[in-house]
């Protein structure tokens, strides 16, 4: 009897659903922990390392906050939202720093089930919320970016807007004071956690205002909600924002009758003018330029040189195939289609769900702006599927028993989640660095000073700074074409030019931090170099760096190290492209060859490689189409780690070299085909 009473209590049922969905989400994320724990190479300092490259930026910031200081101009994320939260968790919990950054995403990202279930409960549809929570918490895209070890702001980047959506819907349905104060609170937290959410928050508030004007134009509380929410978008300090919001909230709560529409209109107009004057639209324009129009700021900042656009090389901002788009959002194409149908049906039944459109549309921008956006559509589409399933159950109950209906719903849910389970099983992401790489960089920390620089590609910038506690020229946040030019040049040109460029780029970068805002050092370091060395032709200046008699006039202020991991060969053609571009035209018109490959087949005395090249089994020549090309030399590498290799000359007039990696330490790269220019590069020679 007592059991039946508990089941009749809607709050206990709701709580049970939240707990079950949360535990389900966490357990699914523990699969990667279980799998990765089998590999010693994924461990450092007695804990699994993280799998997010950008995560090391926040880890560095948290580490510096724990230490209480960081070096000037070291690009540390000291004081950033995720670093701050990590710092406090480290201070108040008994867990190690490595364990905290490993598991934070596991537990925080799973909180997405709470607003999903609460939102569905506002429509008196708990089943809709429960099914949606199960699907959304582990759908391909959301899982990929919030799995264990994925230490990044993505762990709350969907949780927070779903809470905002929940309070907007609750405000529409209940018109309560709790929603009125909670709405700006969560918008403020979201903006602090993820400043790039500004555009989405503006869209949500704007749509809420339009909804108010259409359906609730005579209700004051909705206008006050818009004003309070808009105040969080201002650039003033958070404590001033909070004070103004609390005062206005208190005035409305205590003096509703005296706050007539004229006063509310004046407050709204003043808020709008303040936002415009404080540059409120600038963040929106930046996001549109970077992700939609693929603009590179370096082209705008520099009036002379046209650098390589980094957006052409980032997978996250590449256009995504439509089938992949559907799978990433809902686990499978069929579930996506049912979810879309369910969401349209949900909109017809409950018009307040129109507030979810900005989140859904942002996710659909993945078709143009890149696959990283798909996570936004995940919870909204999951709600559509949950609604469809709840309607399906209502139909079943009319024809069959409750037990039969429940069995059908459970079976359908499991069937829906099966592709997601398969994805989780197959998605075995490696850690960013191996144990050997992390240990090597950790050793460098004991050799180098904090003011020293490591010149490497931007992919490795954050983790290098974290493990070695040094400075870098580029990283995952500083990698415009004008930034990447210098490490690209140092890695892909000859050793003499590499040494000179490494020294110049580091010293000029340090000088740029203290230069006036309108100084050429702030806009283009390369032009500043040319000015100081009395050079007007960029090609002649860069060529002069290869000459032994080139004299560096800039005083040496620190040591410089080069980090050139073997696996960088997989992306080295991209790395080189940044400095082989024609700086006057922006066109890559200086051809070079550097191509990694693995064998696909061997027949008739020929080796068919994955890059389309057909190599003779004696390695003396290769074919591209019908053209037979001679090989200059064969370089057999027995051990990259030990530096054991053998060079066999073949034709000294030929322009191409074949590297044969016997130990195959680099995945998918047993052969490397390169021309003489790449063979003489610092990356290959060193």
What do the PLM-derived regions correspond to, one by one?
Residues 209, 247-259, 324-350, 686:
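Hydrophobic, aromatic-rich transmembrane alpha-helices
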Residues 54-67, 72-96, 107, 154, ...:
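Short hydrophobic/aromatic helix or loop-helix immediately within or flanking a transmembrane segment
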Residues 22-29, 104-119, 128-172, 179-212, ...:
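Membrane-embedded helix bundles of polyisoprenyl
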Residues 1-44, 116, 129-130, 245-273, ...:
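Start-transfer (signal-anchor) and selected internal transmembrane alpha helices
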């Amino acid at each position: 009897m007592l059991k039946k009473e508990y089941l009749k209590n809607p709050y206990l049922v709701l709580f049970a659903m939240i707990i079950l969905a949360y535990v389900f989400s966490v357990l699914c994320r523990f699969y990667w922990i279980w799998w990765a724990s089998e590999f010693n190479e994924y461990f450092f300092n007695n804990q699994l390392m993280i799998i997010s490259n950008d995560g090391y930026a926040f880890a560095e910031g948290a580490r510096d906050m724990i230490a209480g200081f960081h070096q000037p101009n070291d690009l540390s994320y000291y004081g950033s939202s995720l670093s701050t939260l990590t710092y406090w968790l480290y201070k108040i919990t008994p867990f190690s720093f490595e364990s905290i950054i490993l598991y934070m995403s596991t537990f925080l990202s799973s909180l997405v089930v709470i607003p999903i279930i609460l939102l569905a409960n506002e429509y008196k549809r708990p089943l809709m919320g429960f099914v949606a929570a199960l699907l959304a918490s582990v759908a391909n895209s959301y899982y990929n970016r919030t799995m264990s070890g994925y230490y990044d702001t993505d762990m709350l980047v969907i949780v927070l807007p779903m809470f905002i959506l929940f309070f907007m819907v609750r405000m529409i349905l209940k018109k309560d004071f709790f929603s009125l104060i909670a709405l700006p609170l969560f918008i403020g937290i979201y903006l602090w956690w993820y400043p790039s959410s500004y555009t989405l928050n503006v869209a949500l508030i704007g749509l809420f205002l339009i909804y108010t004007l259409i359906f609730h134009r005579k209700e004051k509380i909705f206008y006050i909600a818009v004003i309070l929410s808009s105040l969080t978008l201002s650039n003033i300090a958070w404590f001033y924002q909070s004070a103004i919001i609390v005062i206005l909230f208190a005035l409305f709560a205590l003096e509703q009758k005296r706050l007539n529409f004229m006063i509310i209109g004046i407050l709204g107009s003043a808020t709008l003018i303040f936002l415009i004057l404080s540059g409120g639209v600038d963040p929106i324009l930046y996001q549109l330029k970077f992700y939609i129009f693929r603009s590179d700021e370096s082209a705008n900042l520099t009036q002379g040189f046209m650098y390589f656009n980094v957006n052409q090389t980032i997978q996250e901002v590449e256009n995504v195939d439509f089938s992949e788009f559907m799978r990433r959002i809902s686990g499978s194409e069929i579930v996506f289609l049912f979810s879309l149908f369910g969401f349209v049906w949900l909109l017809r039944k409950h018009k307040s769900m129109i507030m979810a459109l900005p989140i859904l549309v942002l996710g659909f921008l993945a078709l143009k702006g890149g696959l990283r956006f798909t996570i936004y559509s995940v919870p909204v589409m999951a709600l559509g599927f949950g609604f469809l399933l709840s309607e399906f159950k209502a139909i079943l109950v009319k024809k069959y028993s409750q037990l039969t209906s429940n069995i059908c719903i459970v079976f359908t849910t499991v069937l829906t989640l099966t592709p997601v389970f398969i994805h989780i099983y197959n998605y075995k992401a490696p850690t960013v660095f191996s144990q050997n790489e992390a240990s090597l960089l950790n050793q460098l920390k004991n050799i180098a000073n904090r003011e020293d620089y490591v010149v490497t590609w931007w992919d490795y910038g954050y983790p290098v700074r974290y493990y070695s506690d040094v400075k870098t020229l580029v990283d995952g946040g500083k990698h415009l074409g004008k930034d990447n030019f210098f490490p690209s040049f140092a890695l892909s040109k000859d050793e003499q030019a590499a040494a000179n460029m490494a020294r110049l780029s580091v010293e000029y970068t340090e000088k740029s931090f203290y230069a006036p805002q309108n100084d050429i050092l702030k806009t283009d370091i390369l032009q500043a170099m040319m000015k100081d060395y009395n050079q007007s032709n960029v090609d002649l200046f860069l060529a002069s760096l290869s000459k032994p008699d080139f004299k560096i006039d800039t005083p040496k202020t620190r040591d410089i190290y080069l980090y050139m991991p073997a696996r960088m060969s997989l992306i080295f053609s991209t790395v080189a492209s940044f400095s082989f571009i024609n700086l006057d035209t922006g066109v890559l018109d200086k051809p070079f060859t550097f191509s990694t490959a693995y064998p696909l087949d061997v027949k008739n005395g020929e080796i068919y490689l994955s890059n389309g090249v057909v190599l003779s089994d004696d390695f003396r020549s290769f074919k591209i189409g019908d053209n037979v090309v001679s090989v200059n030399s064969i370089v057999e590498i027995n051990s990259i780690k030990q530096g054991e290799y053998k060079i066999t000359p073949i034709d000294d007039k030929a322009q191409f070299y074949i590297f044969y990696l016997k130990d195959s330490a680099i995945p998918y790269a047993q052969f490397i085909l390169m021309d003489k220019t790449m063979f003489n590069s610092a990356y290959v020679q060193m």
